[in-house]
Amino acid sequence: LEVAQSTFVLDQPQGLDTPVAQGGTNFSGGQRQRLAIARALMKHADLYIFDDSFSALDFKTDAALRHALQGETCDAAVLIIAQRISTILHADQIVVLKDGEIVGLGTHDELMETCEVYRAIAESQMKGGE
């Protein structure tokens, strides 16, 4: 729970025994995402796929969670699918897709130099406060 920034569960009246309503409606979107990540980490897998798993998190929680995940997933491959540049900023390799086609491959710095699509997204998000 701690790695996934999900200690809010312990503050629930029933703690870890708190029932999850159909569709998780008794938790916020960010809380549901953190619970899903905590469940995934319980398996100690060789591969983790996080498909837009950080989108409902505020930037501070997103950064703290990604930092904590580094230690927890150091012996595994991690694939993060994201629209928010800050979520993938420090990835070893970023694949940029446009209309289902790969239009860029590299690190953030490399893509800022070589990939117009990536650069446009990054600049747009920086202007928007992300």
Model-derived regions: residue spans:
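Hydrophobic/aromatic position at a conserved helix-loop-beta junction
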Residues: 35, 40-43
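C-terminal portion of ABC ATPase nucleotide-binding domains
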Residues: 13-15, 60, 67, 71, ...
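Catalytic Walker B motif of ABC-type/P-loop ATPase nucleotide-binding domains
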Residues: 48-52
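Conserved H-loop
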Residues: 75-83
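Conserved "ABC signature" C-loop
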Residues: 1-19, 44, 60, 117-120
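A short, proline-enriched helix->beta-strand linker immediately N-terminal to the Walker B motif
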Residues: 42-46, 75
